[in-house]
Amino acid sequence: MKWVTFISLLLLFSSAYSRGVTRREAHQSEIAHRFNDLGEEHFRGLVLVAFSQYLQQCPFEDHVKLVNEVTEFAKGCVADQSAANCEKSLHELLGDKLCTVASLRDKYGEMADCCEKKEPERNECFLQHKDDNPGFGQLVTPEADAMCTAFHENEQRFLGKYLYEIARRHPYFYAPELLYYAEEYKGVFTECCEAADKAACLTPKVDALREKVLASSAKERLKCASLQKFGERAFKAWSVARLSQKFPKAEFAEISKLVTDLAKIHKECCHGDLLECADDRADLAKYICENQDSISTKLKECCGKPVLEKSHCISEVERDELPADLPPLAVDFVEDKEVCKNYQEAKDVFLGTFLYEYSRRHPEYSVSLLLRLAKEYEATLEKCCATDDPPACYAHVFDEFKPLVEEPHNLVKTNCELFEKLGEYGFQNALLVRYTKKVPQVSTPTLVEVSRSLGKVGSKCCTHPEAERLSCAEDYLSVVLNRLCVLHEKTPVSERVTKCCTESLVNRRPCFSALQVDETYVPKEFSAETFTFHADLCTLPEAEKQIKKQSALVELLKHKPKATEEQLKTVMGDFGSFVDKCCAAEDKEACFAEEGPKLVAAAQAALA
């Protein structure tokens, strides 16, 4: 290995090192500094997001009042940095403002106790009370004309309400990215409110944006969980693999610098430091664009855009081409007689280099798989470097990777075939059965939500070319399973889920895949309520109808976990016919009341 490069790699693991997002000199007034850097519009948006993510139950108007007060205070500090309280940290200033909310105790209960603490404990306390499942339901889009009227009457309020509604539903949303989506939202309404058919223009665009927003939220939640539960090292390893795939022409020293900056930025956003996070993200985009020649040939178009679009574009940019004539991996990591010496002198650096070199050569692998391979390589070196003949011991380490690569390949192949055979709804139901049998203690709404999300892997990834399927599918599954882990952590009910969620971030998906039917589960009593429905079912949107049916399927399995596929098919078929019949009846409610008990009796007989 080239030792000049090796020494430069040490900088990756020195948390103080960073040329782009540097630790700035202390400013007399932090809030004035951030206001000047970000500008009033972005400052206001970020403060609104911060308050909405902490105080998720408060009405929009209350947040607007707080934002106005903080903004006016910041302007005062810009005019005179030595004015009263301008020297306070952002946590102190925003925390003090949160604690002035009169309804804090009534709305948030013990969260009000946080206000008795001093910083930094107070902010940590607020973070612990963020609710990943606040129960507000999906954002309902009002009628197109009403939306356009509201947009034209007060654009700033309209977009502020959008930021508020997303932020309070997603308390870990990546704040600068949410400002970007608000700009996109504005663009949709600017265009569609001038269209002849406003609804025809708005509906598909708003739906497409909603999907992007939900995906963005889930990805950032995984990053925050990675930092919070597994530490900075885990996040940096993930980032090394991802950026090495995306920027394979960049030197490792460059990748290491970007990774260090990214870790700082995401730590700030996950920690509620949204002004610092957005400011540092803008600095990183600036650095990347100034140094694009040494990073990627694909960045030129991104770098001509305004700051929010620029950062988003860089995060989504296509992979660069692999450099020609890369030496075989084995040269530095198997055949070199100094492998153990290099490893033992700087373990994380040596493994970081391995991960970089392996990832840039394998854009078709998922990040999770690359990290599992690095873990296997580390375990092999730990074992072999303690033997009398290390080179002989680790000579075939790359052969040991084969089962680790084949397992997700086979899983994706099998599940894509099942998806192609059953379609998305049928595939979701197959996963629902699979996961309810594995972890029946998990609540029915969570099992339905997670299985529906897992089922979307088919339409998201199985339609991709073969070379892209694995990366797409496994990285998507990591994001969805993190949602299960986050919800389960709040109300833990299954030791199996806790074990898979907490033992290893990179092995979460294989851990869940390997779970068998839980033989220790004591079945629930049969409840007629499971099949008690009313006429309102008929007017529900298709997705909500599916959720009702899928909830019934889960409850059936919790009652009869050993039910065969044939039995389930019979009962769910009867259920479908029952719904169709009553929704077509003249007196729907009477039909549901009369036919419901018959369905219950038939279901009990079928499952007996």
Curated annotation (Swiss-Prot):
Plasma. Phosphorylated by FAM20C in the extracellular medium. The keyword Secreted applies. Belongs to the ALB/AFP/VDB family. Interacts with FCGRT; this interaction regulates ALB homeostasis. Interacts with TASOR. In plasma, occurs in a covalently-linked complex with chromophore-bound alpha-1-microglobulin; this interaction does not prevent fatty acid binding to ALB. The modification N6-succinyllysine is found at residues 229, 460, 588. The keyword DNA damage does not apply. Ca(2+) 2 binds at residues 37, 279, 283. The modification Phosphothreonine is found at residues 444, 446, 570. SUPFAM superfamilies: Serum albumin-like (SSF48552). It comes from Felis catus (Cat). The gene is ALB. Residues 19-210, 211-403, 404-601 form the Albumin domain. Ca(2+) 1 binds at residues 30, 268, 273, 276. Transmembrane segments: none annotated. The modification N6-methyllysine is found at residue 558. The modification Phosphoserine is found at residues 29, 82, 89, 443, 513. One of its GO terms (cellular component) is protein-containing complex. Keywords: Allergen, Calcium, Cleavage on pair of basic residues, Copper, Disulfide bond, Lipid-binding, Metal-binding, Methylation, Phosphoprotein, Repeat, Secreted, Signal, Zinc. This is Albumin. One of its GO terms (biological process) is negative regulation of mitochondrial depolarization. It is found in: Secreted. Disulfide bonds join 77-86, 99-115, 114-125, 148-193, 192-201, 224-270, 269-277, 289-303, 302-313, 340-385, 384-393, 416-462, 461-472, 485-501, 500-511, 538-583, 582-591. Residues 1-18 form the signal peptide. Residues 19-24 form a propeptide. Binds water, Ca(2+), Na(+), K(+), fatty acids, hormones, bilirubin and drugs. Its main function is the regulation of the colloidal osmotic pressure of blood. Major zinc transporter in plasma, typically binds about 80% of all plasma zinc. Major calcium and magnesium transporter in plasma, binds approximately 45% of circulating calcium and magnesium in plasma. Potentially has more than two calcium-binding sites and might additionally bind calcium in a non-specific manner. Pfam families: Serum_albumin. Zn(2+) binds at residues 91, 271, 273.
